[in-house]
A protein has these predicted regions:
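Short, basic, low-complexity termini and linkers enriched in Ser/Thr/Gly/Pro
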Residues: 1-17
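An acidic/histidine-cluster motif and surrounding catalytic segment
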Residues: 16-113, 118-179
Length: 179
């Protein structure tokens, strides 16, 4: 079991309490590779479970790229455990996310969600897992965002509350997802 101490929040991370990561991929092998490589640079990746939902091709034109993505994701390492879910028919992004997030968050109680075109910071998993722990009992916090629209940050802390949902790297809990 690995442990990491963050003196600011005094949070102990262990491989037993890290949120699972769910990555949704389709037909962009280069983007998918960049997303995974960025995640692998996170210290907490090795202790995290990664679930990859690979949607099926919409049509014949997409089949080659979908197959390239599927070949690549089978070669991934650097995580505690990797589970690949290959859709046999095309679900579309929205349906795939709803289904995948619902299944995983109901099983684990919390979740980190990414799509195949995001490049995260080496501290992304640390930030998300710490925020999930800090705000788990704060029912007014429905999700944690890893990205924000460009705003004037003068007077704001590194972490602040925002009334909008951002879908470019986010996390939530099972009880909030049910709403």
């Amino acid at each position: 079991m690995t442990q990491e101490n963050n003196s600011k929040f005094n949070i102990q991370h262990s491989t037993l309490d890290l949120a699972p990561i769910v990555l949704f991929v389709y037909n962009r092998p280069d983007h998918t590779k960049q997303t995974v490589e960025a995640l692998q640079k996170n210290k907490l990746a090795i202790g995290s479970e990664l679930f990859i939902y690979s949607d099926a091709a919409k049509n014949e034109n997409a089949e080659q790229k979908v197959n390239e993505v599927r070949e690549y994701i089978k070669s991934i390492d650097g995580f505690k455990k990797i589970t690949i879910i290959e859709r046999e028919k095309n679900w579309g992004l929205a349906n795939s996310i709803i289904d995948g997030v619902t299944k995983i968050v109901n099983e684990y109680g919390k979740i980190i969600v990414l799509e195949d075109d995001l490049v995260t910071s080496p501290y992304f998993l640390k930030f998300m897992n710490e925020a999930l722990e800090i705000y788990k009992d704060e029912e007014k916090v429905w999700h944690i965002s890893g990205w924000n629209y460009p705003i004037d940050t003068k007077g704001l802390d590194d972490v602040f509350f925002w009334r909008l949902m951002n879908c470019w790297g986010w996390a939530t809990w099972a009880d909030r997802w049910k709403h």
